[in-house]
Amino acid sequence: NQRTDEYGGSFENRARWPLSVLKAMRERVGDGLCIDMRISGDELVPGGMGIEETKAFIRLAQEYIDTVHVSQGLIVEPRYMPYTMPAFYLPHCHNVKWSEQVKADPDIHIPVTVVGSITTVAEAEEIIASGKADMVAMARQLMCDNKLLYNAYRGMEEKTRPCLRCHECAPADIVHLRCATNPRLGRESEIPEELPCAKHKKRVVVVGGGVAGCMAAKTLVERGHDVTLIEKGDKLGGRLHEISCLSFKFDMRQHLRWLM
């Protein structure tokens, strides 16, 4: 913001425009609608907002909003987007350090939501139980497997397909929504949520125990076929073993375990 009028320069001036927008929204919808504001704990851009200015702005904005949703990075700067939508080389729950600081501010009185690479119910429960946030937001993991909460409730967490955080779904605003591991995403009208049992049970041989072979075998079994999976090597999973060997590729190792 390089403006020199009443909307630029000092913190108060720079806050004027977004506060006027939030005020107008609240006046328009009244108290019957919850307004959630997403904001970065740290924009990471030189000269951008850091956590102290973020907290200062939330203190002003809380008059007009019901909850604040803490992220990181700046979406208008592509090089900082991997922090806004954390890729697989960043740690899980990496925005919690910002939501924790917002929660600890004695002058912020509204509920705090945190988002960013929170992919399991266990991670979400730990964040909330430790007081680092009041709520947790998930997006990619639920696109990868919308039965996350159902499986957790039933004690079947191991059945949940883990998100790779690979960003296959990221260009959804310009192309059809897709997922690297969930073939149904974006094709819900074509592929039923529960695959029907085959009309005629068959004995099927799948040759090759790589990722595609394992997935084909799992799907065939779900449809009721008698499946034999043949792999020339000594382990299933194919190239995923080599790809996931680096320490930061935790999500791919999780996917490998899920496949098995």
Where are these regions (language model features)?
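N-terminal Rossmann-like dinucleotide/flavin-binding domain of flavoprotein oxidoreductases
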Residues: 240-260
